[in-house]
Amino acid sequence: SCPCDANSCIMSATLSNEPSSRFSDCSFSLPSRFSDCSFNQYSSDIIHYHECLLNEPSRTDIVSPPVCGNYYPEVGEDCDCGPPANCQNPCCDAATCGLTTGSQCAEGLCCDQCRLKKAGTICRKARGDNPDDRCTGQSGVCPRNT
């Protein structure tokens, strides 16, 4: 049994049919909580499998056309700091999603104040059997040495 304080839980086999939890006579309210079991499983997974959360998706994984201003640098964009009114990155031109004049990079563990760190600079310390990850001097992204 996986108790949930709400009328129905996310991932529940059924939705509550109680009138107090419905939007109207012909709809159900959407669950807003995970059951205790789901929450505990999620917490355990984060603790034991958190390494995969560090894997950034590749720009080529996106199948839709690039959209400047969505906070995600896609193919053809040097950076993406969101809409011009929200951009807080001095290295990125929010209107073009390109680097500002004189900038070499806009983000990443190998980027410091809009300048690329030197090749060989440690950007991520060794963990387990994996060696230190080092900057290439060509990108702000810290490559994974596996």
Swiss-Prot record:
Question: Which UniProt keyword terms apply here?
Answer: Cell adhesion impairing toxin, Disulfide bond, Hemostasis impairing toxin, Hydrolase, Metal-binding, Metalloprotease, Platelet aggregation inhibiting toxin, Protease, Secreted, Toxin, Zinc, Zymogen
Q: What does this protein do?
A: Snake venom zinc metalloproteinase that inhibits ADP-induced platelet aggregation (probably by binding integrin alpha-IIb/beta-3 (ITGA2B/ITGB3)) and degrades fibrinogen.
The record's section on SMART domains has: DISIN (SM00050)
Q: What is this protein called?
A: Zinc metalloproteinase-disintegrin salmosin-3
Remaining remarks: The disintegrin domain belongs to the long disintegrin subfamily.
Cystine crosslinks: 2-37, 4-9, 68-87, 79-97, 81-92, 91-114, 105-111, 110-135, 123-142
Give the Disintegrin domain ranges.
65-146
State whether keyword Zinc applies. Answer: yes
Return any one Pfam family short name. Answer: Disintegrin
- Provide GO CC annotations from the record: extracellular region; plasma membrane
Q: In which tissues is it expressed?
A: Expressed by the venom gland.
In the record, what terms sit under GO molecular function?
metal ion binding; metalloendopeptidase activity; toxin activity
Keyword Cell cycle applies: no
Q: Where is the Peptidase M12B domain?
A: 1-57
Its Enzyme Commission number? 3.4.24.-
Task: Name the cofactor(s) required for activity, per the record.
Answer: Zn(2+)
Q: How does this protein assemble? A: Monomer (disintegrin).
Q: Which organism is it from?
A: Gloydius brevicauda (Korean slamosa snake)
Matching entries from SUPFAM superfamilies are given as: Blood coagulation inhibitor (disintegrin)
* GO BP terms: proteolysis
